[in-house]
Amino acid sequence: MTVTIRKLHPHFFGEVSGVDLRNPLTPQQARDIEAGMDEYAVLLFRDQGITDEQQLAFALNFGERETSRGGTVTRKEDYRLNSGLNDVSNLGKDGKPLPRDHRTHLFNLGNCLWHSDSSFRAIPAKFSLLSARVVNPTGGNTEFADMRAAYDALEEDTKAEIEDLICEHSLIYSRGSLGFVDYSEEEKQMFKPVLQRLVRTHPVHGRKSLYLSSHAGAILGMSVPEARLLLRDLTEHATQGEFVHVHKWTVHDLVMWDNRQTMHRVRRYDQSQPRDMRRATVAGTEPTVAQQAAE
């Protein structure tokens, strides 16, 4: 089958047809989808009733799987999924919605903040692929922001100001902004800040983009208040309506996005109702900047 892509937003976000993800991709299909990611940054595949194994097999066409270690406060023995996918649901191991005061639930509320997946890792994620298995009846839309278009729209003096800036990223920054500040010593070590460039250049088409995330909490060479004001201003700019596409989920949607070129967030929803979303994450291949101690 031939891969076709229909653009859904003036800047980015395409809807793919001509692919059944229950079946292995042909080499040409894999090339076409990766080229689509380079161009559109986010791709939607509708009506994909896939298993965890099929979702992971699809993801592995585009690189190696990123492990979940270092991105959660959930203990391994409490994982609901053991298939290699990331659990982005509101469900516990028993399949029921987590209590509102459950530590995992409170930590996961950070997904409602604008972010790029795994920017808190020294080598951040390349692609994320999210499959909707159970959709919440109200709310829960995911918003995506095109960081390329946002960069292009900056004033030239702002581009010059931020070109060489290096940020510190950590889950402690994003969760701390919501008042989640209680960590074990092991978690503090696991969530130690890493360094990321504020401006990234895409390895294929060479287009520049802002590399923002709620995980960013400091900029090297700046006071913390000054850095956070700049990051807030840039985030407000980058998430204006003209750069954002809102996706309303239906069951068996699969959305795939490039973390190097976008940010996203989930909107609030009724946490008493189940929402089962499962993510395969394709690992990045190199850091955005050479790492050093980010204390």
Locations of regions flagged by a protein language model:
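Fe(II)/2-oxoglutarate oxygenase catalytic core
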Residues: T2-M256, R260-E295
